[in-house]
Amino acid sequence: MSARPQNVGIKAIEIYFPRRCISEDELEDFDGVAKGKYTIGFGQKYMACTDDREDINSFALSVVSGLLEKNNIDPRSIGRLDVGTETIIDKSKSVKTVLMDLFAPSGNMNIEGIDSKNACYGGTAALFNAINWVESSSWDGRDAIVVAGDIAIYAEGSARPVGGAGSVAMLIGPDAPLVFEPAHGTHMSNYWDFYKPNLSSEYPEVDGPETIQTYLGCLDKAYDAYRLRAAKLKSGAANGHSDASSLASIKVDDFDYTLFHSPYSKLVQKGFGRLLYNDFFSDPKNEKYASIPANFAELDRKSTITNKDVEKAFAAFGKEAQQTKLEPGMNTVRRCGNMYTASLYGGLVSLLSNIPSQEIQGKRILLYSFGSGAAASMFAIRINGSTEQIVKAVDLKNRLDSMKVVPCQTYVEALKTREATHNAVNHKPVGQLENLWPGAYYLENVDHMYRRTYGRIPTNAN
């Protein structure tokens, strides 16, 4: 009997985002709001934007083809393909089935996996499915691909500045340089903070204050669950340790970097401060918290989610740690905005692109995945091999710098076009192909039966 696969994780990664973006600073002027509302209040600099030439299928085709081609992956070596998205354009047909066109020329149609959906969490559900498949008795020796991607757009109003777009594809298999640790902590519950009940529109229903509280409240619960599980694994299963001591035994200091689902930068910073608060709450008498008011330990934990004094105290307490543990993963969100299911993994691409391979060896990364409604998980990655090829293939910094900043009016007009043509039949998109990257897929036509066909920009185009 062959040995079970070891060191299962990410072997290669690719990211795709639109070629164009708008400036959040210019958007403040365009919307007539106070200066700093978007750039300081949300912590955002730019937001990726696209028009009717791109949809979730074209995003997925672009990112998976890029993963295969840049890393010389044989399509026949893939045995599973999972997709996570909340950008739904068909209530029955999955994005995964469209992606099978990339594998048909090789004759490989024996690929398991399908789409997962729950707001921004679907990519993580897809990832866990792929990891579990590789580690299971069903594994056939081939690698898996996980795709996470979305087009995040909002109706005119206060939420529009926290949109964005992008997708990430990950090659999952054994003997990987980025290894997933076995402990997961998950919290799921029923909330109505963000949802999309109107299938005739791409826009969600959003309760802004509620979604912030849900994000942070689920972080508390997922972090608790993660620490309990990680402590048990660390000690060799349950051995009489209390939950309280288990919670205190796992802390942010155990990790070199932290990554969060990233709707916008300011919420990520709140999330990091919340982790530090949870460490304090589990071990308030530790001398390292001497600068924190002692009475914070006696406050009801749930009530502190909206307590500005607590938030400010831990923002100040964690200011230095934030620069080293959090900041390296922020490039993508600041340039592309919210990528929904892909945002956490866009942060991972940023982190890898900012830290040299030799410096990141042996380091641990704590990840927080969240999707409204709500689903949340905490898990960890350990770096166990060279990341040089991953960084070289992705070429993130050059690609982010090459994005074209367009006027805000262009973005508004693109959204109006999408509104007018959403669910349209006998529709040929009007977006200009020169606005797309070389090698990108695009929507070519929607026929009288809603069937979509796609084209591709030549890879050698300017």
Curated annotation (Swiss-Prot):
Active-site residues (renumbered): 86 (proton donor/acceptor), 120 (acyl-thioester intermediate), 261 (proton donor/acceptor)
UniProt-listed CDD domains: init_cond_enzymes
UniProt catalytic activity: acetoacetyl-CoA + acetyl-CoA + H2O = (3S)-3-hydroxy-3-methylglutaryl-CoA + CoA + H(+)
Short name of one Pfam family: HMG_CoA_synt_C
Pathway where it operates: Siderophore biosynthesis
Coiled-coil annotated residue ranges, if any: none
Disruption phenotype: Leads to a swollen morphology and a cytokinesis defect preceding lysis of cells.
SUPFAM superfamilies to which the protein is assigned, alphabetical: Thiolase-like (SSF53901)
InterPro entries in UniProt: HMG_CoA_synt_AS, HMG_CoA_synt_C_dom, HMG_CoA_synth_N, HMG_CoA_synthase_euk, Thiolase-like
Residues bound to (3S)-3-hydroxy-3-methylglutaryl-CoA: 120, 211, 261, 270, 338, 372
Gene3D superfamilies linked: 3.40.47.10
GO BP terms in the entry: acetyl-CoA metabolic process; ergosterol biosynthetic process; farnesyl diphosphate biosynthetic process, mevalonate pathway
Family: Belongs to the thiolase-like superfamily. HMG-CoA synthase family.
Keyword match Transferase: yes
Keyword tags: Transferase, Virulence
Cysteine disulfide partners in this protein: none
Protein name: Hydroxymethylglutaryl-CoA synthase
Enzyme class, broadest EC rank: transferase
Superkingdom of this protein's organism: Eukaryota
